[in-house]
Amino acid sequence: MFVIACKFNPVFPFIFELVAGIRLFHPDEKIVVVDSDSDDKSYLGILREKHGVITEDIANKNWMIGAYWYVYKKCPDEDFYYFMHDSMKVKANLDYLREKDLTLLMTFERGIGGYNGWAEAINNETDYDYTKSGQGCYGPIFFCKNKVMKKMLDMGADKFMPVTKQDSHYGERAYGVFLEAQGYDLLKCSLYGDVLEEERPTGRSGKYPHNTSWQYPVEKIYASLVDKKRL
């Protein structure tokens, strides 16, 4: 199952290219799009009629993490989940990722940047220690077997919901904590390695405004560079 959080802007309708790519390489796979309280929701009908997408018009205000948990709790028995942003492209079949428990798009050192605002709450409200050393889950964008999400639910990860852009940065780091606590080496689980390294002038994405066309078989576009509503 593909699970996509979408804040639709008709000027930059990234979701259409993403869903078309998924359907090209996964014609029979379930696709669920969760609307994040978009002003224009006309796209939902287009996705249903043209691509057979399951749409959830729930006025989601909890960013990507809110969309992921909404779908997981509604559909808890899927074997595998591809958790994505709408500003992505699928360029090939992704079935091979099902062979692994967990694949992250990219990582980064979670101690960098100071976005550790959920640390105290996680330490107080779960049985797990939030450490600033380790990897964050960029996005968070990840693809995983059911057991990974079931364990995160058992860990209490669903208690922590972003409501602001800053909170979404906290979530990237928190999910690094929860996934590492399950025993996963996130660097080894990552498709493309460290996002900050790739954003350097010598990295594959290069310096601002960053070119991600090299990413294959799935690409994350820096949508906020063109769609200022995402800032």
Predicted regions located by residue number:
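ER/Golgi luminal nucleotide-sugar-dependent glycosyltransferases, focusing on the catalytic module
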Residues: 1-231
